[in-house]
Structure formats: structure tokens, C-alpha cells
């Protein structure tokens, strides 16, 4: 264990040194300054409130989404495919995956709700009043309490949402559609091209034929989830999991329907 911690410290230190030029540029860029000013308006704005983080798993097809119409909600990545049938739009939309953003650029350009994207996405998404740039990284494990600084992506956009929700002050965060299970198998983070309808998400065209995407890294995402659970607990807040049939075991489970008044 001490050796593992030592190796992780050395790796994190090396990552930090390698990130310095990029992080310095990001910190000095006027687009980031303007974005951070907008981000600060969200800090603790929803203190004491609850929110739902909507994953994109197939379980959404067995989840009564109509119940969320008057709730604070985080949508992720290509949830806009569900907007027509939802009858409402989520409070926020979050995406930090380059492949998703690049291949869905027209959709993201048309988003009018508050949009949170990685700093890397500036090459496709120029500044706009509803767009917020997050300086996210693949390495350097951490939970960012202040999202105007660096966030670790934790191998899943859900982890970015958990950091955003904490920054915004939400006291109870409820996960739905976070199935934590994929029919498509392979090496974590490997980029593949979909050969047909998508069996891993709520819509067959989510990562439909010809779409490039990266295979999930569920182990790394669990590292992030454990960090999030601890930070929320230490702050007297909670994350619970109401995913229908989900395989994630990090957070306490709750039956989705029990969260709403009859």
C-alpha cells in the first residue's frame, strides 16, 4: 500500500508538471475569465435543494421522466435526443467528451439552456452567454469543490456533474439512468466506431452507426464516485442512486417512485 501511494504521488506530480503550460494558458485566457464570472453566479445558488443527474443508460426507457418536469435536472451529452418526448428540457446540459461534442456540434450550437463543456471544446463552441467552459483533465485525481479551477473528469461526465452540483450547493443529488453497465465490451477508453444501433444507451441513434466513441472505463469512474461520496458526506450532503436496475453499488439505492409525492 505505501508503495502504491508513492507511485501514485509520483504519477500525479509528473502529470502536474506536464499540465503546467496548458493550465497556465487556460488560466490567462479571456474566454475563461468571462466564463468563470458566469460560473460564479451558480455558486451555492441552489443550497438546500435537490437535483437529478440524468444518465443516458437504457434504463431511462423504464423511468417515468415526466416526474422530473418541475425538478432541477442535469442532462448529459446527447440527452437532447430525448427532448422531444420529454416535454421539457433539463435545467443544465453537460458534456466534456471531445468525440461527442465534435460529432454533435450542430446540436450543441442550438442548445439554449445553460451548457457546461470542457475547455477543449472552445475549438468548436465559441463563447456565448449560456456556455460555460470547465478546465477538465483526464489525469490528476481530485474532486473539485470550486469548478472555476481544475476538475478531474473521472472517466465519466457523471463525475463532472457531481462536481458541478456540489459547487451549486445542492444538498441531495439523485442519479437516474446511470446503469454502469455496457453491452459492448473491450479495452477501456479505446476509440471504436459503432457498426449499428446503440444497445448501451436510451436511444438506438445515441452512438448510432458510424459514430466514433470511447469504451467505458468503469473502474476509474468508481474511483471518482467514491471520492464524490466522501466529499458529499463530509459536507453533510448526500448522493443517492435511483437508477432502475442499475449496477452501480457506490451510492445508497432508492426506489425512483418513492421520491415523489403521490
Tell what function each PLM region has.
Residues 2-262:
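Metal-ion/cofactor- or nucleotide/acyl-coenzyme-handling active-site neighborhoods
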